[in-house]
């Protein structure tokens, strides 16, 4: 199993249990689904319910949302406007370029060439995006973007993460 973590915060962002697509060698698209699940619903294999004390029936809480967000404990955040988002992108890209120059100089030119197209595309879709930080809620790290796309007639959540802002870890 592989997990992708934010290079600045160490937060888990997603894993290879989801369908992944690398776009322009700079952006991962992670395809999720909307789920609902019961919290605190513990099933003991082999337990004999008739031999147990009567359950007084507690209200089971449910949570629903995008599986990637729930499973990796991503936290929704936001930007007041497109200008604030643009400022974040510019600052974050500077941090990524600096890190690439130090650790992977051969990737810098590809990154700079392809990221402009991707950023322009993201800014054009700003109103359709939701934004998520990792579990630490550190806004200095990667802020993932989520949008819904019509795939085969279904509304599918797609998480967008900058490839160079992630490190891959194998388990």
From Swiss-Prot:
Domain of life: Eukaryota
Domain TCTP: 1-171
Stretches that traverse the bilayer: none
Any one GO cellular component localisation term in the record: cytoplasm
Subcellular location, record wording: Cytoplasm
Record keywords, A-Z: Calcium, Cytoplasm
Major localization listed first in the record, in broad terms: cytoplasm
Summary of the function given for this chain in its UniProt record: Involved in calcium binding and microtubule stabilization.
Sequence similarity: Belongs to the TCTP family.
PANTHER family registered for this protein in UniProt: TRANSLATIONALLY CONTROLLED TUMOR PROTEIN-RELATED (PTHR11991), TRANSLATIONALLY-CONTROLLED TUMOR PROTEIN (PTHR11991:SF0)
Protein name (record): Translationally-controlled tumor protein homolog
Organism, scientific name: Aedes aegypti (Yellowfever mosquito)
